Amino acid sequence: MSSSFVYKSLFLVPILAVVAMQLSFVQSVLSLNQTNEYLHHLCLNRQGTYESGSKYARDLNNLIQMISISILGDVVVFSGDNSIYVKLQCRGDSSTSTCRSCLDTAFSGVSRRCLNNKGRIIWYDNCVLTISNISYVWRDRLPEQFLYFNAKDVSGDAKSFNEKTRTLLYKLKEKASSKENIPNKKNYLYATGEESLGKMKLYAMVQCTQDLSIKNCNVCLNWILGKLPKCCNDKQGGRFLSTSCNFRYELYLFVKLTTI
């Protein structure tokens, strides 16, 4: 997919280190086109930098190692005088090993791209990693977003395709942000689905980070889905990602479909 508009805003993250992640039990599927492609990053320069070998650097490295070891749960750690917040969100169909691998890749990747920045965000197919030392409200981070869309337009009835794409994504939004979708149950704040398009199929997913409430997940998804027409109308595939929620749709199977 070719990238399009990138929106940036430097509102930033809490004084604790937390991992919010989701690993769901999923059914096996065939012909799954699954990658861990690098997507985008932001270096949050207003948060300043730190020196290699400093206490901050040691605390951050130790925290990343702790998160990797404790990948199945939430982690809260103070970092002495240098409060650090780390949020890792893996895609809902990620296994523990896939999530751990994505954390390693993301930390290495953002360390190269944002050398010694205290504030940085990086997106991959399988995870998003946020590192910061400043308190934030999740709504303030909504402008930290970007989108991709397929350069190819759909053939045939584009209006019908757009309507079916919108209907499927909003259906998944309702499923992901349902009050019945309580914490500690599979597929919390995450949903996948498919829709028949004649001889083809449309596949889609939506997800919120698990530091959001169900109500705020619904708000976040409504906000980014409102960008769907401008983002992706008539396109064979598209995705819109923020630090708190995202959606994606394609005409090929890119995600393991969740069981009902």
Swiss-Prot record:
A GO CC term assigned to this protein in UniProt: extracellular region
Signal peptide stretch: 1-31
Keywords associated with the record: Repeat, Secreted, Signal
Pfam families for this protein: Stress-antifung (PF01657)
Disulphides: none
Primary localization class, coarse: secreted
Residues in Gnk2-homologous domain copies: 38-136, 142-254
Compartment(s) where it occurs, according to its Swiss-Prot or TrEMBL record: Secreted
Similarity annotation: Belongs to the cysteine-rich repeat secretory protein family.
Entries under PANTHER family matching the protein: CYSTEINE-RICH REPEAT SECRETORY PROTEIN 29-RELATED, CYSTEINE-RICH REPEAT SECRETORY PROTEIN 38-RELATED
Record's protein name: Putative cysteine-rich repeat secretory protein 23
Organism whose genome encodes this protein: Arabidopsis thaliana
